[in-house]
């Protein structure tokens, strides 16, 4: 299991979700991906995408105008 980070700052909907989806395609089951973004819609969109696609949201938080969502690949 490996840890990866995706910088989706300054991207607007739907790009954070699309970039997340593209990155996850390259990862293995059990890997962890931390997505850093600034689009408030991502706080709902990425967890919804993760659930639909069998991944698990480990955490989501807002800090210094950034949203950090951690997903474990399912």
Question: Whereabouts are the PLM-identified features?
Answer:
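Generic structural detector for well-ordered beta-strands
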Residues: 7, 36, 70-72
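Amphipathic, hydrophobic secondary-structure cores in small proteins
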Residues: 15, 19-55
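Short amphipathic
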Residues: 2-9, 34
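C-terminal structural segments of small proteins and small subunits
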Residues: 47-74
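A generic structural signal for beta-strand entry/edge sites
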Residues: 3, 32, 64-68
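Residue-identity detector for glutamine
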Residues: 5, 21, 28-29, 62, ...
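Absolute protein N-terminus
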Residues: 1-2, 74
